[in-house]
Regions:
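A residue-identity detector for tryptophan
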Residues: 76, 133, 148, 161-162
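Short, low-complexity, Pro/Ser/Thr/Gly-rich segments in the mature regions of secreted, periplasmic
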Residues: 150-164
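Polar/charged side chains located within well-ordered beta-strands of beta-rich proteins
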Residues: 4-5, 15-18, 64, 92, ...
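Surface-exposed beta-strand edges and their flanking turn/coil or helix-capping segments
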Residues: 3, 9, 44-48, 73, ...
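Membrane-insertion modules used to breach or fuse lipid bilayers
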Residues: 52-108
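N-terminal prepro-regions of secreted/extracellular proteins
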Residues: 1-51
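Membrane pore-forming effector domains from diverse proteins
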Residues: 91-151
Length: 164
């Protein structure tokens, strides 16, 4: 068994849940969120797969769209500021569809293919960010923590080849 992997990013992400209102603190603390980096992260297997024999075109459009949520490990008191800086709500659920097709080759890596299976995994944009704070009494920025937030961005596919 040999695996090839590729990502399909979806720009038509549909937000499907209501926004949760931000909790505002009454303190005089000001938080600053600084973006550090953004990477792609492969999530859980969706349970969706399709397989076929050589010469058959396996269609991804037969797979249904799935809904999965954004998430974060950010502290509740800086969540609103972090969401505004990154541009998405960490509590929303997103529905992402996918479509396309791939023909199963008769040979792969010089070997005869018995069948191939295409498996779909969730794909996230993972943002890492740093939070600092100041107040009316503390002017020098103080480190508060480093956090992450993930937003659904598409699907990661694994094409598994089984040989004769």
């Amino acid at each position: 068994e040999v695996v090839e992997e590729f990502n399909v990013f979806n720009t038509d992400v549909i937000e499907t849940t209501e926004e949760i209102p931000d909790i505002q603190t009454r303190s005089h603390i000001t938080y600053k969120v600084t973006k550090l980096n953004r990477t792609s992260e492969i999530g859980a297997y969706t349970g969706q797969s399709v397989s076929g024999e050589p010469g058959v075109t396996i269609s991804l459009s037969q797979m249904k769209a799935t809904s999965f949520s954004a998430s974060s490990n950010v502290a509740w008191n800086v969540k609103g500021k972090a969401q505004a800086t990154l541009g998405f709500n960490f509590s929303k659920s997103y529905t992402i569809g996918h479509s396309g097709s791939r023909k199963v080759p008769s040979t792969h890596n010089g070997r005869k293919v018995k069948r191939a299976e295409l498996k779909a995994y969730r794909l996230y944009d993972k943002h890492t960010f740093k939070v600092t704070w100041t107040s009316i009494h503390v002017k020098q920025p103080q480190y508060y923590g480093t956090y992450w937030a993930k937003k659904p961005s598409g699907y990661h596919y694994k094409m598994v080849y089984y040989y004769k």
